[in-house]
């Protein structure tokens, strides 16, 4: 499977050292099978006057059963709880790989309203139910990263 990472620089050797804490699926290297999603990730860098660079990887799916994986097929209560734990620094899970929806602008607004206590979980789930997830994959361990092979990059 081909996966993409959007940034301001080429990342030929992904690592976990540069990952940020308290994001959707916790510390890790984030990619997507959706080129358009990676291009959106580049947008914030382009707004700051930097180049947007999409790095491309081949992911060895045949070995995925070697990884402890968590997959979210939709925006759900389970997804929302996981995001809440990761974003608040309370994630203690040991998944190698987490797959699920991106908290894009509309989804992010709903998540923030829930985090701030302005809507309850039921209302948040009702709002998210109709959103089609943009897929992101978080490689959270070196074991998972070993299945990702750099193929090249392009500047937007």
Q: Where are the model-predicted features located?
A:
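Extended catalytic/binding region for NAD+/ADP-ribose chemistry, centered on the ART fold
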Residues: 20-44
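Conserved NAD+-utilizing ADP-ribose enzyme module
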Residues: 23-24, 44-156
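Short aromatic-glycine-(Arg/Gly/Cys) micro-motifs in beta-strand/loop hairpins
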Residues: 1-23
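Short amphipathic alpha-helical surface micro-motifs
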Residues: 11-14, 35-40, 118-121
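Short, conserved beta-strand segments within well-ordered enzyme catalytic domains
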Residues: 3-5, 30-31, 56-58
């Amino acid at each position: 499977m081909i996966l993409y990472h959007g940034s301001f620089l080429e990342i030929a050797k992904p690592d976990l050292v540069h990952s940020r804490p308290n994001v959707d699926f916790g510390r890790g290297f984030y990619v997507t099978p959706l080129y358009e999603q990676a291009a959106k990730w580049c947008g914030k860098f382009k707004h700051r006057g930097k180049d947007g660079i999409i790095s491309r990887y081949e992911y060895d799916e045949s070995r995925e059963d070697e990884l402890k994986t968590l997959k979210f097929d939709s925006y759900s209560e389970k997804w929302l709880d996981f995001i809440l734990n990761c974003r608040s620094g309370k994630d203690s899970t040991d998944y190698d790989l987490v797959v699920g929806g991106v908290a894009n602008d509309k989804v992010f607004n709903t998540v923030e309203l829930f985090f701030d206590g302005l809507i309850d979980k039921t209302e948040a789930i009702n709002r998210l139910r109709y959103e089609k997830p943009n897929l992101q994959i978080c490689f959270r361990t070196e074991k998972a990263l070993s299945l990702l092979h750099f193929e090249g990059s392009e500047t937007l």
